Amino acid sequence: MRIQVDTHTHTYASGHAYSTIIENAFAASQLGLPMFCTTDHASSMPGAPHYWFFNNQRVLPRFIHNVAIVRGCEANICNDGEIDIPPSVDSHLDWVIASFHEPVFPSKDSLVHTQALIKVIRSNRVDALGHLGNPNFDFDFEAVIACAAEYNVAIELNNTSLKGETRIGSIDRCYEIAKVAKKLGAYVTTGSDAHFCEDIGKFSKVEQLIDDIDFPLDKVITHTPKQFLDFLALRGRAPIEEFKKLMV
């Protein structure tokens, strides 16, 4: 199978990534990737931008190098299940990932992580949960993924985690999470988690996982741009006028 949307990418605005959005779009165009979400880290992450950065994404063209640009953010899960972007930002974004990051949310125990994830899902402010395979943030797979399925929040399959070079110990957990998502009928999304433009749209590990467990493609929201946009509509997000031509 081929993934056509990358829902987790970073620019140098994240503080520890190395490309501009134009460079990311050019790399995507060279790869033949028709759409990606730009999802820089929210402000609690060291080096990340002020929330005005996300409000002002309205100035971004909807297409750069003929690649569709989805305006997004990777928010940090903090406290007992909040995210670190003000509610006033929500209307400026098309796509919000919520993730645990050690500098913001020190690793605790499975119950605390599970409760935080469920609270984030039920807030209805996030569209996906990012890189859940991290063993530092163990959680009750069944409880969280069942809640995500109920609220139509996507579970991210993260290609960087599956490489085994960061968030060490994630690979087997990613496979198990995907199997639980398949069993419970949850949606999954796919993120390169690119911090450099040459990694945009690179999904060899994720595609292998999807093939290995025969994950149903109608639940992979990034299989086509139309499936991704249909998922945004399911989430209650307003249609993006400039993307109407992609709904075929």
Swiss-Prot record:
CDD domains: PHP_HisPPase_Ycdx_like
UniProtKB keywords: Hydrolase, Metal-binding, Zinc
NCBIfam families, A to Z: PRK09248.1
Binding residues annotated for Zn(2+) 2, in chain numbering: H16, H41, H195
SUPFAM superfamilies reported for this sequence: PHP domain-like
Protein name: Probable phosphatase VF_A0774
InterPro entries, alphabetized: Phosphatase_YcdX_put (IPR023710), PHP_dom (IPR004013), PHP_phosphatase (IPR050243), Pol/His_phosphatase_N (IPR003141), Pol/histidinol_Pase-like (IPR016195)
